[in-house]
Amino acid sequence: MDHHQLFSLCSFSYIFKIKKHLFVSLFLLSLLIFSTVVVDVMPSLRIGLLSSSSSQTVTKECDYSKGKWVRRASSSSSSVNGLFYGEECRFLDSGFRCHKHGRKDSGYLDWRWQPHGCDLPRFNASDLLERSRNGRIVFVGDSIGRNQWESLMCMLSQAIPNKSEIYEVNGNPITKHKGFLSMRFPRENLTVEYHRSPFLVVIGRPPDKSPKEIKTTVRVDEFNWQSKRWVGSDVLVFNSGHWWNEDKTVLTGCYFEEGRKVNKTMGVMEAFGKSLKTWKSWVLEKLDPDKSYVFFRSYSPVHYRNGTWNTGGLCDAEIEPETDKRKLEPDASHNEYIYKVIEEMRYRHSKVKFLNITYLTEFRKDGHISRYREQGTSVDVPQDCSHWCLPGVPDTWNEILYAQLLSMNYRTK
């Protein structure tokens, strides 16, 4: 064998080895890239496959805010979304019991929310109670927040055989009580609380020597003084918005204060944005990002027709959800402010979520209290097209709250 032949064979062997190693390297590189893509693109799928809860898991991300209302195959006046609680629930304020006060139709109870592209996990009261054992679930906001709180109380109590065990820690009655209410589930050592704070920030007297037209001020840079009670909560659901309008602020002599100075030129939505910045600072400074699951619920739509709440607006003729999307109101401007602030917080507190219920609620013009007020209410009192009959629409909000907690592996063992 001459030198040329030896060189050719060596070259061939060398090239073959290179190609072999190159093929193996390319195969391993491809496998690595594929694995990385799967991890990055489908983290929720990975979580669903590798973790489990005592009841169920959500295996993929879902936008529960988009979908449609569908009529259930079978229902009754005491069954909402299969939860089986009715107006007899002792945790309902009398003002939310529409049938008790004369509403005859029950069709508004016959609907369930169906998200696009996925299913809403069935609410499991026993599971949520067990996950929340030795904990606190806290609602903070206006009376629409109370609407949601009472809904959750009734939903959770269905898993308790002896409901008389559940009690208010200070002995306060639910009906007609304003302010702070804390209901204890003794077997789970769990409290489910409502704290009234329509603005979330402080509202009080104006600074000394303020003009006479300034009766009160909303201090947009000072968080609610009762907020120290909320520290350490496991789940917090905030809401605000219905008091952020001119009717309930500047037209009543309530102006906005910042840095201990009243700013009479500050607009309502500018003030709302500043108050959310104050809320953001409190959450990031006072809450443990490893423990507290924080939600800010979006704006709950109103459905006054032929007027506003104080000009004869009505909704008592509505008995079914809206079916024409073209008739829906545009998204509330409040939501844009809320969403933006939450996005700013994610890098420091990953357990902060936007509980978006506006679009699905916009369809439900049929679910309001309307004229079915408590006995003794004056006939001249405007219809209530803001609050909701219970059982009713807020039950769906709590189903979505539960689904989002599942997707976040809330207190998974």
UniProtKB/Swiss-Prot annotation:
Keyword Transmembrane recorded: yes
Topology of the protein relative to the lipid bilayer: Single-pass type II membrane protein
UniProt keyword annotations, A-Z: Membrane, Signal-anchor, Transmembrane, Transmembrane helix
GO molecular function: O-acetyltransferase activity
One GO location term (cellular component): membrane
Location(s), subcellular: Membrane
Motif mapping: GDS motif: 141-143
Record flagged with keyword Transmembrane: yes
Chain span(s) of sequence motif DCXHWCLPGXXDXWN motif: 384-398
Functional summary from the UniProt entry: May act as a bridging protein that binds pectin and other cell wall polysaccharides. Probably involved in maintaining esterification of pectins. May be involved in the specific O-acetylation of cell wall polymers.
Additional free-text comment from the UniProt record: Contains 2 motifs that are conserved in esterases, but it is unlikely that this protein belongs to the catalytically active pectin esterases.
Family membership: Belongs to the PC-esterase family. TBL subfamily.
Protein name: Protein trichome birefringence-like 9
Species whose genome carries this gene: Arabidopsis thaliana
Lineage of origin: Eukaryota, Viridiplantae, Streptophyta, Embryophyta, Tracheophyta
